[in-house]
């Protein structure tokens, strides 16, 4: 678009002789059950969830609610709706990822949310949800990401195979100007920023992860990842680990400090799309839409992956986020609900 096996501990000396750690499948065990189901208004016939996320500055979970046209903010502690903001006109048809709003990001007092109806990005005042500006896009949006260090908004547009980058001049009404367009032949899919290295990472649709310089907006590297279909990305910048979700049912760990070297892979449920990681607990959350499950992995200091638990989710449940405090949220598009899981 943002997710079984077991490993024993590996010493540093042993690692020196290994190019790649591959986890073995874990023996079948009963799937664990989510602790709560959160219903989203208008979701009785399903919601085309996609890029759900967490806004640390607001302390809320971001739920762009697809064809309802609403951005829903959840209080992760209570599981209750903290705010609902209208982004675009509700769609009449059944749920789909490219209807209404499907991605949102926070930055510098603003919320930016995708609008598939225009297509464009709607800019809200984060204090009250008031619409401040609308930005027209060249093509339909996928990911909407704010790069705070440069006050830029990056919008991926897979159909046009490009990323549009906008400069944001803050004020009562922000001034938004197109900075550049980055061509991405064969992509882009997913997007994460590495501010330590002034990089952005995105995937191509087949076996490649692309490195972009966030200062020049130029691609500076192309890494071979072990995925037939690379999808979601997550980054632990402090350790230099880039996690890549493979739609065929695998997750990989790349070393961003050594040319994208593959450190480890592990099998997981098929249909992987969006993934999420918690650097504090060193846990990686990997849902599979086809397997209707989510695996929680422990990430070792070497990058090896150890499966801690597998939860039952739902068919089509492809997106996940967490609040960094052990609360994990998985979308259930068919039911129009959010599944809450307590990290073990």
Regions found by a protein language model. Give the residues of each.
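N-terminal secretory signal peptides that target proteins for export/translocation
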Residues: 1-5
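Short amphipathic alpha-helical "recognition" segments used for binding
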Residues: 7-10, 161
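Bacterial N-terminal signal peptides
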Residues: 9-22
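Predominantly soluble domains enriched in secretory-pathway, periplasmic, or organellar proteins
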Residues: 20-344
